[in-house]
């Protein structure tokens, strides 16, 4: 690994935009720009694979948030998870996010 690079990890990102007229597109684009690959099978949540740290991802997203919005970025791992998703969704997560 070169200096400044970070090993790619999986993160779950969840946000609530609480002001009327919020620009979801800017928040969504900032999340996508932080990711090597991503999926969003939920409202206001993304599972991404990124070579950025949680702090660096947050730094890309927070300029698009208001003070009453909420954001959490949590590192996810491939050894302890569960959910109710379709087979194709699980396949994508296993191969692209955790793979």
Name each model feature, range by range.
Residues 37-78:
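Short, intrinsically disordered low-complexity segments
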Residues 19, 40, 48, 83-87:
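Generic structural "secondary-structure junction" signal
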Residues 1-6:
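Short, Lys/Arg-enriched N-terminal segments with co-localized hydrophobic residues
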Residues 23, 27, 53, 57-61, ...:
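Amphipathic alpha-helical interface surfaces
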């Amino acid at each position: 690994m070169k200096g400044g690079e970070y090993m790619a990890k999986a993160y779950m990102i969840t946000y609530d935009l609480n002001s009327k007229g919020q620009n979801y597109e800017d928040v969504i684009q900032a999340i996508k720009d932080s990711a090597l690959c991503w999926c969003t099978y939920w409202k206001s949540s993304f599972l991404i694979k990124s070579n950025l740290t949680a702090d660096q991802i947050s730094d890309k997203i927070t300029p698009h948030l208001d003070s009453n919005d909420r954001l959490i970025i949590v590192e996810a791992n491939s050894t302890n998870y569960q959910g109710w998703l379709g087979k194709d969704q699980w396949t994508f997560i296993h191969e692209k996010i955790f793979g």
